[in-house]
Amino acid sequence: MGRLFGTDGVRGVANTELTADLAFKLGRAGAFVLTEGTHKPKILVGMDTRISGDMLEAALVAGILSVGAEAICVGVVPTPAIAYLTRKYKADAGVVISASHNPVEYNGIKFFNKNGYKLKDELEDRIQSIIENNFEGVPSPTGENLGRKITCESAIDDYVEFAKSTIDVDLKGLKIALDCANGASYKTSVETFRELGAEVVVINNDPDGVNINKNCGSTHPEELMDYVVKQGCDLGLAFDGDADRCLAVDEKGNLIDGDFIMTICGKHLKDQGKLKDNMVVVTVMSNLGLSLAFDKENISTIKTKVGDRYVLEEMVKDGYKLGGEQSGHIIFLDYNTTGDGLVTGLQIASIVKETGKTLSELASIMTKLPQVLVNAKVPNNMKDIHEKDAEIAEEIKKIEEKLNGCGRVLIRPSGTEPLVRVMLEGENQEELDKIAHALAKMIEEKANA
C-alpha cells in the first residue's frame, strides 16, 4: 500500500477509495496510537455536510469504540472548531471527516492531537503501519471495557463564543454578505456575525448533502462578488466546505484573496505592536506583490512549501503570529492551531470597523502582479516529470529567461488530486496565459504518453 496520508489527512472518493472499511481501520488504529496509556480516552469527531459523512462517521466511530476509547460526536462543525474544541474539552484527540474544498464525491479523514495540531508524518506513518500489520498488538476489549459514543450538543455554541472572543469590537453598522459554500460554516458563521451586531445577508447556507462547494464558496466566489454589490454590503466573506479557509470581497465586488488578507492583517498587527519580529510566514505560491507591499511596511516574510501544515510548522518553531496561503488558509496562532475561516473573516471585519476605512482602501497597499495557474492532468506516478524530462526543464529555463527577473515559473504537484499546477507570474497577463497553457499542455502530453 502506498502512503495513505496526503498533505491533509487521508482523502479519496468516498465508498470506492475512502471506504467504510478503511474508515473503521483508521478509527481503530488512530485511537490506539493517539491515546496510548490513557484510561478511557476521549476522541472528538466532527464532519462537514457531505452525504458520505454519515457512512464514514459510523465506521470511524466503530473503530474508535473497538479499542475502548470514547467517541464524542459533535456533528457538523468547521474543521477549525474541532482543533479548538479538542483543547477546550480536554479530549485526547480530534478527527474531522471532510474533504475541505474538494467536490462532493470526495471525503477525507484528518486527525488532530490533543493540542489541536495536525499530526506529524511519523504519527501518520505509525497509524498506517498498524493497519498494514493487521492490528498486531492492538487490544480488542470486551464487556465494560468497550468504548461508548457520546453526542455533544454544545459544540456550535462553544465555538461561536470562542470566535467572538478573538476581536475586541462589535460589528454594528457593517453590512456583511456570507457565502457558506453549503458547508460546515452554515450555522457558526451566520450566528457569530449576527451576535456581534452586523447586518448579515447569506447565500449558499442550505446544505443538502450534495451541494457542498458546488459553484459557490471560496473556490467559486463569483456569485458573492455580484451579491455584495447588489446588496450594497461593506464586505463579503466566502468560506470553503469545512471553513478552514476564507476569502473576502470588497464593497466594489473585487476579490480579496489570502495574499491581500495577510497584507492587511500583517500591517494592522504591526501597527498595534503585535506582529512578532515583524514577520509573516507565507508559501512559495504567494504573489510577488505581497513581498513588495511588505517591504514598504518593513515586514519580512519566510516562504515555505505549499500546504498550511508547512506554514504552521514554521510559525510554531519561532512563535510567529500570522501566516497563510493565497487560497485563504490563514493562521492566527494567538487564536487557533490551524487555518480558521471564521476567525479570519472576523479579523478583516474588525479592521474595517476599527480603521473606518473601506476594504478596497485597506487592500490598496498591495498591487497584485498578474498570476496564471493552469492544472495539468498527470498520473500520480508522473507528478515529478517536470524535474526528470530534459525538454520540459529546458522549456521552463527559456520561459524564466524571457520573464527576465520580473516574474517566475513554479510547478508543484497536487497533494490530493492527480495533477500538477503550473503557475506563472509576470507583468503581462495575456502573454502569461499563453505560455502557461502551452507548458501545461506539454507536461500533460508527455506524462500521459
Curated annotation (Swiss-Prot):
Q: Which cofactor does it need?
A: Mg(2+)
Q: Which reactions does this protein catalyse? A: alpha-D-glucosamine 1-phosphate = D-glucosamine 6-phosphate
Q: Offer an example of a GO molecular function term for this protein.
A: phosphoglucosamine mutase activity
Q: Which InterPro entries match?
A: A-D-PHexomutase_a/b/a-I, A-D-PHexomutase_a/b/a-I/II/III, A-D-PHexomutase_a/b/a-II, A-D-PHexomutase_a/b/a-III, A-D-PHexomutase_C, A-D-PHexomutase_C_sf, A-D-PHexomutase_CS, Alpha-D-phosphohexomutase_SF
Annotated active site residues, numbered on this chain, are 100
Post-translational modification comment from the UniProt entry:
Activated by phosphorylation.
Q: How is the cofactor bound?
A: Binds 1 Mg(2+) ion per subunit.
Q: Which residues are recorded as modified (Phosphoserine)?
A: 100
Q: Does the keyword Isomerase apply?
A: yes
Q: What is its EC number?
A: 5.4.2.10
Do you know which Gene3D superfamilies this protein is assigned to? Alpha-D-Glucose-1,6-Bisphosphate, subunit A, domain 3, Alpha-D-phosphohexomutase, C-terminal domain
Q: Which Pfam families match?
A: PGM_PMM_I, PGM_PMM_II, PGM_PMM_III, PGM_PMM_IV
**Family statement drawn from the similarity comment of this UniProt entry:** Belongs to the phosphohexose mutase family.
Function summary: Catalyzes the conversion of glucosamine-6-phosphate to glucosamine-1-phosphate.
PANTHER family hit by this protein: PHOSPHOGLUCOMUTASE (ALPHA-D-GLUCOSE-1,6-BISPHOSPHATE-DEPENDENT), PHOSPHOHEXOSE MUTASE
Q: What is this protein called?
A: Phosphoglucosamine mutase
Organism name: Clostridium novyi (strain NT)
The UniProt gene name for this protein comes to glmM
